[in-house]
UniProtKB/Swiss-Prot annotation:
Gene3D superfamilies named among the record's database cross-references: N-terminal domain of the delta subunit of the F1F0-ATP synthase
GO cellular component: plasma membrane; proton-transporting ATP synthase complex
Listed name of the protein: ATP synthase subunit delta
Subcellular location: Cell inner membrane
Matches recorded under HAMAP family: ATP_synth_delta_bact
Keyword Transmembrane helix: no
Top-level division of the source organism's lineage: Bacteria
Length: 179
């Protein structure tokens, strides 16, 4: 995984520099779409086929996109460069790094919230507000329900984890009692 991140970083940074000259959100949508298309087994099969030219592969990728940027010269050049350098499989990692650059620019971060029970709108808003104060940045929440937590929440922001779940507390008590 580390080598994928290392290889993908220059592509993500170059695309981000291009995006800074326009609409970063639109470019983010484009790269997310590309990442989804690039993960399809059929696309990977066609891309690796010696019977299909690199230009045809690039056209196939661009044709599968809904983003209006897909018809632009910069998007075409980016996709063609990835195809020519056999880097289509890197698109999910490129998209992830692009999103991280976008979040850094906006002073924001993605947050994964895992809760034992579904969170209502007001509960989620209150939780996100308190987490934004704690982490001192704007958070973009993705919520998941995991009943094995028993109660509470587990919050992941980047490489920081805040686990206030009942399961984590019980595990801590068990470790203290058996030590």
């Amino acid at each position: 995984m580390a080598e994928l991140a290392t290889i993908a970083r220059p592509y993500a940074e170059a695309l981000f520099r291009v995006a800074e000259g326009g609409d970063i959100s639109a470019w983010s949508t484009l790269v997310q779409e590309l990442a989804q298309v690039a993960q399809l087994p059929e696309v990977l099969s066609v891309a690796s086929s010696p019977k299909v030219s690199r230009t045809q592969v690039a056209e196939l990728l661009l044709a599968a996109l809904k983003s209006p940027l897909a018809s632009g010269a910069q998007a075409k050049n980016f996709v063609q460069m990835l195809v020519d350098n056999h880097r289509i499989a890197l698109l999910p990692e490129i998209a992830e790094q692009f999103e991280a650059l976008k979040n850094a620019r906006e002073g924001a971060a993605d947050v994964q919230i895992v809760s034992a029970f579904p969170l209502e709108g007001a509960q989620l808003a209150e939780l996100v507000t308190s987490l934004e104060r704690k982490f001192k940045r704007k958070l973009k929440p993705a919520v998941e329900v995991d009943s094995s937590l028993i109660g509470g929440v587990r919050v992941t922001v980047g490489d920081e984890v805040l686990d206030t779940s009942v399961r984590a507390r019980l595990a801590g008590m068990q470790a203290a009692l058996t030590a």
